[in-house]
Curated annotation (Swiss-Prot):
The keyword Transferase does not apply. InterPro entries: Peptide_deformylase, Peptide_deformylase_sf. CDD domains: Pep_deformylase. NCBIfam families: pept_deformyl (TIGR00079), PRK00150.1-3 (NF001159). This is Peptide deformylase. It catalyses: N-terminal N-formyl-L-methionyl-[peptide] + H2O = N-terminal L-methionyl-[peptide] + formate. Keywords: Hydrolase, Iron, Metal-binding, Protein biosynthesis. One of its GO terms (molecular function) is peptide deformylase activity. GO terms for biological process: co-translational protein modification; translation. Its EC number is 3.5.1.88. The lineage of its organism: Bacteria, Pseudomonadati, Thermomicrobiota, Thermomicrobia, Thermomicrobiales. It comes from the Bacteria. The gene is def. Belongs to the polypeptide deformylase family.
Amino acid sequence: MAVRTIITEGDPRLRQKAIRIRVVDEEVRQLARDLWDTVRAARGLGLAAPQIGVLRRIIVVAIPPDYVEEGDPGVELTLINPEIVRASGRQVGLEGCLSIPGWYGEVPRSMHVTVKALDLDGREVRVKGSGLLARVLQHEIDHLEGILFVDRIEDRSTLRYIPDEEEETAEAATGT
């Protein structure tokens, strides 16, 4: 198990564009395992490689069953070189970020997205997401571009700090 340190706002790597992955090899698969170990330990809904200081284009999405419709097993995705190829609709919802601990704000996002990426075998996949899944995908892909959720907030008055003892409640709404 390799839980990595999640870097926080102020670290310049969070503001840099990640580099495209050319070959899905054992090094990339190990990076994916590290991302999974780290996101699970942090109890987040997603994590991008730049958040652990690695400027590579890979994300994981970890939406547990209790965040989705009853009977749905949840969502676990590893996406390499993800890009949004279609987006529609609009939603505004509370977001937080493991790299900006304790801070939350209302962020506008597309309601529906289609993402093209590679899987861990190097095969092209397309993922369609709506609602929370669409939000998490957009949030994590933003990290690959050096964009943080606070950059997307239209109404700065919604940005607020929620102390640790209240964070669990807020994470039920966000936690990326």
